[in-house]
């Protein structure tokens, strides 16, 4: 995998995806002078003795408490230890790695006041595969993602646990030593700078975005295959229809469906003499639904790309004037809104697919396919219960899609009286994506089975490649058998990108392609 050169303030979504996936990271050396200037500004503030939040005061509701010069290092260590109060299952290592890279990019912009050696340690941990163990719960998305980032920072000072480059879990101090790194002694403001920020929420939201983008593409493929299995029409995908409505996502989704179905002998077989006038919405309105989901993902992607390239620390250091200004960039409301948009898109991708599965198993709607896609209905139940499973998963996602950003609860003795819930809103996306992937896996199986009943007619070249890829892993269902491993196999083909890769077409995504 090619190395990513991280230029703070100018990183693209594709670079963040590569970092999440384990690409080697190189910090642009051009940022070093700015880091040093900001650190010198903090040192000057300490020398002057003027009260500045987080440098020589307490935190949160305790901001009015002045801290003696001899206690400044203890203050920074204490905030890390006291704030490392997360609970729950650890976050996947790839997301922690992404969080670390986001924090690195923020610190490297020279507005946080940390020393070059602090940035260098975080950079080295990424380079040498030292990944802190970070519990998934405990952030409300303001004042930043304090608890998760405290667990990251605790590892930097040799406290807590890490995964080493081989994935072994061990004490943080031992992991640092194994990587030939020394624990950090925090300087003024550094504990707060490392804890304050939206990097945990943003990492989770980016992971959710990437997963949703993959599933949207897979959903276009399985949706097109369902059109052929149900002997549906491609007329609703005519570009003239969508040009009149002007929504970019809808236009792109319709174009993708047309290309996926191009050359289908199944479609050609019922161009003449078919008395059906219009298909049900789950087939006919795919461009409108999937296109709207694509537009949501693109909007969320733009927000998250901006957030990933910003600085969400507090206070912020301005070396040109020697000031440290208190603000609220740690409030993750933009990330929370983006996560809510991604959740809506994931919910609808799965919901529309489940409706297509329901259509395929119902002989009253499937245009000649046998009940539950089995040759001997009654003796065999076929795809009866996979459709029920899809319905269950879609219903779970409907509950999870409720906006997290509208829920706020005051913290820190009411000093932090409005919070974003971005971390919770972004973390649920991982489970929602798993559910949606399973629904699409079931649709893949059902649509391929439906096409099997239409033999010797064949679908398009793109969709026949998809069917062949599936059949290499899962045979046709002729008689009832134990289905769980086959559902898992089909879901893996969706999740891992094999379905989209087999289609061999450039399908639309968040970057506008």
Swiss-Prot record:
Protein name, per record: Histidine ammonia-lyase
One biological process term in Gene Ontology: L-histidine catabolic process to glutamate and formamide
Gene Ontology annotations for the cellular component aspect, listed alphabetically: cytoplasm
CDD domains per UniProt: PAL-HAL
UniProt main location, coarse: cytoplasm
EC number(s) given by UniProt: 4.3.1.3
Gene3D superfamilies in alphabetical order: Fumarase/aspartase (Central domain) (1.20.200.10), Fumarase/aspartase (N-terminal domain) (1.10.275.10)
Disulfide bond residue pairs: none
UniProt catalytic activity: L-histidine = trans-urocanate + NH4(+)
PANTHER family given in the database record: HISTIDINE AMMONIA-LYASE
Residues in cross-link 5-imidazolinone (Ala-Gly): 142-144
UniProt keyword annotations, A-Z: Cytoplasm, Histidine metabolism, Lyase
InterPro entries in the record: Aromatic_Lyase, Fumarase/histidase_N, HutH, L-Aspartase-like, Phe/His_NH3-lyase_AS
Record's signal peptide: none
Pathway where it operates: Amino-acid degradation; L-histidine degradation into L-glutamate; N-formimidoyl-L-glutamate from L-histidine: step 1/3
PTM characteristics: Contains an active site 4-methylidene-imidazol-5-one (MIO), which is formed autocatalytically by cyclization and dehydration of residues Ala-Ser-Gly.
HAMAP family registered for this protein in UniProt: His_ammonia_lyase
Family of the protein in this entry: Belongs to the PAL/histidase family.
Organism: Methylobacterium sp. (strain 4-46)
